[in-house]
Regions:
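Short, low-complexity N-terminal regulatory "tails/caps" that precede and couple sensory modules
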Residues: 1-19
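Metal-dependent catalytic cores of enzymes that make or break cyclic nucleotides
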Residues: 12-13, 19-170
Length: 176
């Protein structure tokens, strides 16, 4: 019998693969967090909320993992937004707002190049779509919005509302 190369245990290989992705995601999120005070920890909070929402919705483990990974990366496209826009304290001008609105497409373009991230890239692209079609970047509405993107949008909105409350008063958490 000829010596055949041993195949790695598939389950162990997949777990190792997932850990490598997790480490990569953590590195990317840390790079983004370093650029913007608001973004710091935002992606982690959104990803944590996604786990709660996914459990409440009864989503399976694979779908939950995919949405959780996308939630960590949902603002990765902001890496291409100029600091003058990303860190601006006051209201954005129309051109600045248009620049900011490109981040979901930029995130999609970054992530879609990795075969195992193609589905995650789609969730990232559509996390600012709105049920009524007034979202961006593609103006999708209703059931045309991927369910995972809808879950991320809810978690993202909750975190944005809670964060803006906390900017105004330290008692905001007690009020919520």
């Amino acid at each position: 019998m000829a010596n055949q190369p041993q195949q790695p245990d598939t389950e162990l290989h997949n777990a190792s693969h997932l850990m490598q992705y997790h480490d990569l995601i953590e590195s990317i999120v840390a790079a983004l967090d370093a650029r913007d005070a608001y973004t710091a920890s935002h992606s982690d909070r959104v990803a944590d909320m996604v786990l709660v929402l996914a459990a409440a919705l009864g989503l399976d483990e694979d779908e939950t993992t995919r949405i959780h990974m996308a939630a960590h990366l949902h603002d990765i496209g902001k890496i291409a937004v100029p600091d003058s826009v990303l860190r601006k304290a006051g209201p954005l001008t129309r051109p600045e707002w248009e620049e900011m609105r490109r981040h979901p497409v930029t995130g999609y373009e970054i992530l879609r190049k990795v075969d195992d991230f193609k589905e995650i890239a789609i969730l990232v692209r559509h996390h600012h779509e709105r049920w009524d079609g007034r979202g961006y970047p593609d103006g999708l509405s209703g059931h045309d919005i991927p369910p995972g993107s809808r879950v991320i949008a809810v978690a993202d909105s909750i975190d944005a509302m809670m964060s803006s409350c906390l900017l105004y008063t330290s008692d905001a958490a007690d009020e919520l």
